[in-house]
Amino acid sequence: MGINRRQFLQNSSAFLSACAMGTGLSAVSEALQAQANKSRIELLGSYWTFSGSAIPHSDREYSSFDFRDRVEAMAKRGFTGMGIWHADLAHILETRSLKEMKQILDDNGIRHVELEFINDWFVEGEARVQSDKTRALLLEAAETLSARHIKVGDFEGKTTPMPVLIESFAKLCADAANAGTRVVFELMPISMINTLADTLTMLEGANAANGGMILDTWHVFKIGIPFAEIARIPLRFLLGVELNDGYLKAPEGMTIQEETTGHRQFCGEGEFDLKGFLAALARTGYDGPYGIEILNLNLRAWPLDRAVEHAYTTTLAQFSG
């Protein structure tokens, strides 16, 4: 992909400034390379980061910000991807069609669409009935919106035999393939699969070309996955990445559910070694977009533009130095 006019001017300015200050050519070259690397990073605004006053796991999960406003604000700042939660999608569809949503996304250059979240896709009974409704909604949307992937997982640690998980995941991937999209399993410390090894076992067993995992740094650091293990993840299974920061150890009295839904932090503002994580990730060959998923009680009151600006700049800063 060729460099665009803006990047050319930025690089030229950086070169001239460095020369004026007497900086050595090798240092100038390194600075320009770092700037070029940052220009290739694609950021995806995960749903909860820009959902306004929406509250996870409640009956008010839809965003307080209009869909078009979110798309335009993210695109203006440089995002090329956007996440949409199932309850928010249903809310949007009360006033807009999927075709209209697609047009808004296309008009603003948002080419990476993430849909979430399917829970209980591996169980039976009433929970599965509700899960299948979400599944149908997201699959229909994925086809029209040309979604990059659909996120799935488990929030309740519902212990399930591996053969059942493999069969269920394979079927989910088959349904997604018919809709032209992929399925990414989000590994969490609170899910029925909470180790990288078991995640890979499920993915290998399902053996679906469109099935893989998404790594969220909050879950990676809470589980304690070594960077060496991350570096060895087969690229064919690594279909998505989400970045955020947080506490290595939760404050006393705070549950993991409270922490993950209300106390995540922007990149560089917590205790995670994000640059170490990114270095390990680079060894896998991952070159897809990076989601930014911040669930924070204070963030719910922020204006949209402030949230977009802060999320973008703090995340991009992790790719330098």
Regions found by a protein language model. Give the residues of each.
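Residues at the N-termini of beta-strands
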Residues: G81, H149, G240, G288-P289
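Active-site clefts of carbohydrate-active enzymes
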Residues: G253, H263-Q265, G288, I292-N298
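A cross-domain feature marking catalytic cores of carbohydrate-active enzymes
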Residues: G45-T49, I84-D88, E114-N119, V152-D154, ...
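Acidic-and-aromatic substrate-binding clefts and catalytic sites of carbohydrate-active enzymes
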Residues: Y62, W85-S97, D120-S131, F155-P163, ...
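Active-site groove signature of glycoside hydrolases
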Residues: A142-T160, A179, F185-M188
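Charged helix-capping and loop-helix junction motifs
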Residues: R96-E100, R128-A136, M162-A170, A197-L200, ...
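N-terminal pre-domain/capping segments
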Residues: G2-E143, A177, A208-G212, L235-L238, ...
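Acidic/histidine-rich catalytic cores of soluble enzymes
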Residues: G81-M82, K171-E271, L278
